[in-house]
From Swiss-Prot:
Family label: Belongs to the EutB family.
The organism's taxonomic lineage, starting at the top: Bacteria, Pseudomonadati, Pseudomonadota, Gammaproteobacteria, Enterobacterales
Protein's recorded name: Ethanolamine ammonia-lyase large subunit
InterPro entries: Aldolase_TIM, EutB, EutB_dom_2_sf, EutB_N_sf
The organism of origin for this protein: Salmonella typhimurium (strain LT2 / SGSC1412 / ATCC 700720)
Induction remark: Part of the 17-gene eut operon transcribed from a single promoter, induced by ethanolamine and adenosylcobalamin (AdoCbl, vitamin B12).
GO cellular component terms, A-Z: cytosol; ethanolamine ammonia-lyase complex; ethanolamine degradation polyhedral organelle
Cofactor comment text: Binds between the large and small subunits.
Pathway(s): Amine and polyamine degradation; ethanolamine degradation
Length: 453
C-alpha cells in the first residue's frame, strides 16, 4: 500500500489510511477544527492522488476505528457480502469511481456491488468526485422503500412535513399540517420535533398527527422525533405508531453521547414490526449530519465525511424508510458557508445512495452561518437533480422551535414543477381526490388550508 506521492517536485508522505482519507477532503471548517485537514491545496490534491490508487481492500482493512474497539465498525464489517467484496477488493478507488459513473453500469450492478463496500470505501469514492460526479452518480442509484407511501421511485420527489411548535401546541401543529398538505407536502412523513420528551407529550402530539391522517384518510406516516426509548414506550402504551426515529452517530462513543445503544435500535425495529401502522416493511427513520461525531468528541481523529459515511453503514443494517442528513444544522464551526454546505449535502446524498439507503436531505443553515435562503434553494435543486428522495417543508422554511432555516412547503412544489417530478404515487392519488393536484400539477385550490374545514 502506497502512502506517498510526488507533485511538482514535492514529496507528500502520509502516515496511514485515516490521514489520507482526511486530507483528501474538500476544505471544511470542521476538519480544520479537528486538526485533520490538508495544510494546503497541494497537499489535498496529493492525498486525493494517493487515495485514488489505494485498493478497496486497503481501505476495508484499515477502518478509521478498530474492529475490536467499536460496535459500529463491527456492524459495518460484519454486514459486508464477501462474494461482492471479493469481486472488487483489488480494484483501485479510482476504478470503483469510474465503475459507478459508467454508462455501462446498471442499477442492479450497483445494487450488488454496494453490498461489498464498507463505509470508509464509500467515503473514499466521494472524496475523489467533483460536485457534478456526485450529482450524476447519485442519480444512477435509486433506492426505493415502502411504508404507507413508496419513496425513491425515479421521477418522484417527496417532502417531510415538519410542523414544529415552541410549546408543542397541538392547534399550531395541526394548522401547519393542513397548510403543508395543501401544498402537497407530507408524503415522506409528517414528523414533529417535540419540545418536551416524555411519553405523555409524545402521545398527545402523535394523537394530533394521526387525528388529521385518519380524518382525511391520508396515505402517509406520522412520527414524533423524541428519543427512541420514549417512542417505544409510548407505542407500547397504545400511542399510534408510524415511523420510529433516532439520531445516530458513526462511532460507539458517539452513540453513547446520544444515549443510544444498538440494542435500542434492534428493539425499535421489533416494536415497529409488531405495533406500527405501516403497510410496507420499513418503519425506521434516522437523522445524521457531518460533524456530529466531532461535536461529541467521538471522531477518533477521523474526518467528518468518513464519519458521516459510517452513519450510513450503521443505518443500512436496519433498512430504514428514511434517512436524512441535517446538513447545515450543526453550524459554521463544522460547515462554514454555502460552498461547504452544498458540497456536504451532495456528498451525503451520494454516500447514502451508494450505501443503499433511502436518502434525503434537510437543506438548512443556522442563523450564524455565512449562508442564506438562496443556499437552501440552490442545494434543493441540485439534490433533486441528483435523485434525492426527499427534503423538509415548513411554513416559510423558518423553524421557530429549532431556530434554524430550512426549506418551505412551496419549495417542494417548485422543485416538482421545475423538474417534472411527482409526489409518491399513493400520496398523489390522495391529492387528486382532494382537488389539490391534477395531472401532476397543483390546482388553484393548492396552498389554501381552508379546504380542510
Amino acid at each position: 500500500m502506497k502512502l506517498k506521492t510526488t507533485l511538482f517536485g514535492n514529496v507528500y508522505q502520509f502516515k496511514d489510511v485515516k490521514e489520507v482519507l482526511a486530507k483528501a477532503n474538500e476544505l471544511r471548517s470542521g476538519d480544520v477544527l479537528a486538526g485533520v485537514a490538508a495544510a494546503s491545496s497541494q497537499e489535498r490534491v496529493a492525498a486525493k492522488q494517493v487515495l485514488s490508487e489505494m485498493t478497496v481492500a486497503d481501505i476495508r482493512n484499515n477502518p478509521v476505528i478498530a474492529y475490536e474497539e467499536d460496535c459500529v465498525t463491527r456492524l459495518i464489517q460484519d454486514d459486508v457480502n464477501e462474494t461482492a467484496y471479493n469481486r472488487i477488493k483489488n480494484w483501485s478507488i479510482s476504478e470503483l469511481r469510474e465503475y459507478v459513473l459508467s454508462d455501462e453500469t446498471s442499477v442492479d450492478d450497483i445494487a450488488f456491488t454496494r453490498k461489498g463496500l464498507t463505509s470508509e470505501v464509500v467515503a473514499a469514492v466521494a472524496k475523489i468526485c467533483s460536485n457534478a460526479d456526485l450529482i450524476y452518480g447519485g442519480k444512477k442509484m435509486p433506492v426505493i422503500k415502502k411504508a404507507n407511501t413508496t419513496i425513491g421511485i425515479p421521477g418522484t420527489f417527496s417532502c417531510r412535513l415538519q410542523p414544529n411548535d415552541t410549546r408543542d401546541d397541538v392547534q399550531s401543529i395541526a394548522a401547519q399540517i393542513y397548510e403543508g398538505l395543501s401544498f402537497g407536502a407530507g408524503d415522506a412523513v409528517i414528523g414533529v420535533n417535540p419540545v418536551t420528551d416524555d411519553v405523555e407529550n409524545l402521545t398527545r402530539v402523535l394523537d394530533t398527527v394521526y387525528g388529521v391522517i385518519d380524518k382525511f384518510n391520508i396515505p402517509t406516516q406520522g412520527c414524533v422525533l423524541a428519543h427512541v426509548t420514549t417512542q417505544i414506550e409510548a407505542i407500547r402504551r397504545g400511542a399510534p405508531g408510524g415511523l420510529i426515529f433516532q439520531s445516530i452517530c458513526g462511532s460507539e462513543k458517539g452513540l453513547k453521547e446520544f444515549g443510544v445503544e444498538l440494542a435500542m435500535l434492534d428493539e425499535a425495529r421489533a416494536v415497529g414490526a409488531e405495533f406500527n401502522r405501516i403497510a410496507g416493511e420499513n418503519c425506521l427513520y434516522f437523522e445524521t449530519g457531518q460533524g456530529s461525531a466531532l461535536s461529541a468528541g467521538a471522531n477518533f481523529g477521523a474526518d467528518q465525511v468518513t464519519m458521516e459515511a459510517r452513519n450510513y453503514g450503521l443505518a443500512r443494517h436496519y433498512d430504514p424508510f428514511l434517512v436524512n442528513t441535517v446538513v447545515g444544522f450543526i453550524g459554521p464551526e463544522y460547515l462554514y458557508n454555502d460552498r461547504q454546505i452544498i458540497r456536504a449535502g451532495l456528498e451525503d446524498h451520494f454516500m447514502g445512495k451508494l450505501s443503499g439507503i433511502s436518502m434525503g436531505c434537510d437543506c438548512c443553515y443556522t442563523n450564524h452561518a455565512d449562508a442564506d435562503q438562496n443556499l437552501n434553494e440552490n442545494l434543493m435543486i441540485l439534490l433533486a437533480t441528483a435523485g434525492c428522495n426527499y427534503i423538509m417543508g415548513m411554513p416559510l422554511g423558518d423553524d421557530i422551535m429549532l431556530n434554524y432555516q430550512t426549506t418551505a412547503f412551496h419549495d417542494t412544489a417548485t422543485v416538482r414543477q421545475l423538474l417534472n417530478l411527482r409526489p409518491s404515487p399513493e400520496f398523489e392519488r390522495w391529492l387528486e381526490t382532494m382537488g389539490i393536484m391534477a395531472n401532476g400539477r397543483l390546482t388553484k385550490r393548492a396552498g389554501d388550508p381552508s379546504l380542510f374545514f
